Amino acid sequence: MADFEKIKSIIVEQLGVDESEVTPEAHFINDLGADSLDTVELVMALEEEFGVEISDEDAEKIQTVGDVIKFIDKLKG
């Protein structure tokens, strides 16, 4: 599994939410209050941290913290 703590840290930093709110089930828009700019910045931070490229099409499919974990795992193989 992708490093959940690292992903959580990025989300907390990018969205300014409390660590306790960042669970695999948390939805970025509905639960964590992210807007479209927040999600773009989050994707960019994830790309930089994990050395991966996330296409716009794939980024649109990432809606929860769990989606990020699965996606990073898949990319890192």
UniProtKB/Swiss-Prot annotation:
Pathway annotation from the record: Lipid metabolism; fatty acid biosynthesis
Keyword presence, Ligase: no
Spans traversing the lipid bilayer: none
Alphabetical list of Gene3D superfamilies matching this protein: ACP-like
Modified residues (O-(pantetheine 4'-phosphoryl)serine): 36
Free-text description of this protein's post-translational modifications in UniProt: 4'-phosphopantetheine is transferred from CoA to a specific serine of apo-ACP by AcpS. This modification is essential for activity because fatty acids are bound in thioester linkage to the sulfhydryl of the prosthetic group.
GO cellular component: cytosol; membrane
Family: Belongs to the acyl carrier protein (ACP) family.
Protein name per its UniProtKB record: Acyl carrier protein
Organism of this sequence: Leptospira biflexa serovar Patoc (strain Patoc 1 / ATCC 23582 / Paris)
Gene designation per UniProt: acpP
